[in-house]
Structures are given as structure tokens and as C-alpha cells.
Amino acid sequence: APGGGKVIQGIDLTIPDNKLVVITGPNGGGKTTLAKLISGLEKPDSGQILLDGQDITDLDITERAKLGISYAFQQPVRFKGLTVADLLELAAGQTLSEQEACSYLIRVGLCAKEYINREVNATLSGGEIKRIELATVLARHTRLTIFDEPEAGIDLWSFNNLIGVFQELQESLNGSMIIISHQER
């Protein structure tokens, strides 16, 4: 923390298998720091981070990703020249048929035929890019996905729809999800 203080201390958190956990609190309360510690983007000064009893504290983000931990940033990355289908294949780590790629988009509430060949760029709205990011989570088959303030950059209507998408996503995933939010709904 600026000035050398501790941002987070005394945390004992267990994320159950196949559950959706929402962590809320005020801005500056350490929510994003917690997400970055779990994902491996930041290292703790002390303590342990365990995944299924295995100490992963010293593993970096790449090693944790190989174990099935993924982190979705507040503002998803946009790629000029990369289509939605390309992004889904990158997430899956394999070539997908058009039907497979479209099935991920349909599950997050997007009309697949309209989006599958679109570029992941500034022409997509905040809500669209969030849904595409959720589709990549489905394609990735991760054990633990951390969403850091997924409501950032989208309007209230899109946010309310996104809540439903998260609930449906949780039911179809074979893994856990953490949503970090300053919204207390």
C-alpha cells in the first residue's frame, strides 16, 4: 500500500468447489488486491494460498493458470484484427468448430451468428465485451475464475442482465467463481 501499510491482513477464506462467491466492499478496501493475490498477479508478504490443499503461494500467474485459475480484469482486453471465434479458440487451447464456438456465445446470451466473426475491438459495447469474456471462461474450463468488478464500464441494465448470466454460467461450469464488486446487490 502507499506509505507501506498493509492492504489486507488476517484473511482466512475458503472458496467451496462449484460455488459462486461474491466479495463486496468499498473502493480501496483491498478487494482487487485479494483477487490479484489469489490469481498470482501479486505475491503476499506472509501467509499461504492453497488450492485443493496444495500450497500455490510461490507459483506465478502462468503456473496458477495451468492449475485452472483465471483472472478477468475490470476492463477486458480488446484486440484489433482478432475475431470473437479466434478469441474463443485461444481460450479453449484448441480449434473449435463454428457450432462449438457459437454454443459458448449462446450460453452467455449473445446471438452467435452476429458475433462469431466480429473483431474484438472498440465497436463492441461494454456489455458485449463482458459477455464475450464470459464465453471465453466457458471455453477455458477453469476450476476457479476471478472476475474483478465485472460491472465496470457497463450500464445498469446490462449489469442486471450480467447477474443472470453469472448465475447461469455457474450452473454450467464445473468450477468456482469469485466476483469482486463494490455493488452490494
Per-range role (PLM):
Residues 55-70:
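ABC ATPase NBD coupling module
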